[in-house]
Amino acid sequence: MMNIVENQTVVRRAPDNAGEERVLAARPEAIGFTPQQTALIVVDMQNAYASQGGYLDLAGFDVSATAPVIANIKVAIAAARAAGIKVIFFQNGWDNQYVEAGGRARPTSINPMRLKTMRKRPELMGKLLAKGDWDYDLVDELQPQPGDIVLPKPRYSGFFNTQLDSLLRSYGIHHLVFTGIATNVCVESTLRDGFFLEYFGVVLEDATHQAGPEFAQKAAIYNIETFFGWVSSVSHFCDAVGYKTEQNAA
């Protein structure tokens, strides 16, 4: 449940942007942004992470509560597009031989649950998180449109070995609004790396879902709002950009 304090201090990148500024209610304080300098980041909304029969489900994680998250992300995407905010989708995975995943003498080949799952169930090799397979595909409800950007990523962070930073700088973007799965893994990893690169990161709490128990979501949200960024909600995001839904019009 969001607990946003009204009439709070507003964090601004530069005072001279006030003419175009929108203000997003958030924790620990409201944050000002301009749509042209903001991107909505949709992290790994693939069947692997959000659907029954996908990688997380097969690995023993509960994905039964992802439907409302998908619906909320769909609203956030519509609001972003209507406001002229760039929408960037990430897809995590590799080729079906996992050559792009790298060699075996590395921690990222030993520790990740996805590779452990495939070692336990070799029949899944070439299917889990493999480009061109259903598991890698974005869920049907969240499909890119012309003008959106789709970036593959080989690791948890969307900044590592991708075009993200150079694309954001070329568009003059410095505010990032995060949605997706998993809050405590790829969402938090990308937001943290963005913070280190001087991006303002906001996570829409009700448009994310954790991998693991509920405390993993709470811990990730605590880390973000305390150390690395801001936390808001889809309804507050819609309010900030002037996008009307049945919920926020009531």
Swiss-Prot record:
GO terms for biological process: nitrogen utilization; uracil catabolic process. It holds the Pfam family Isochorismatase. Keywords: Hydrolase. GO terms for molecular function: hydrolase activity, acting on carbon-nitrogen (but not peptide) bonds, in linear amides. InterPro entries: Isochorismatase-like_dom, Isochorismatase-like_hydrls, Isochorismatase-like_sf, RutB. PANTHER family: ISOCHORISMATASE-LIKE DOMAIN-CONTAINING PROTEIN, PEROXYUREIDOACRYLATE/UREIDOACRYLATE AMIDOHYDROLASE-RELATED. Belongs to the isochorismatase family. RutB subfamily. This is Ureidoacrylate amidohydrolase RutB. It comes from Pantoea ananatis (strain LMG 20103). The gene is rutB.
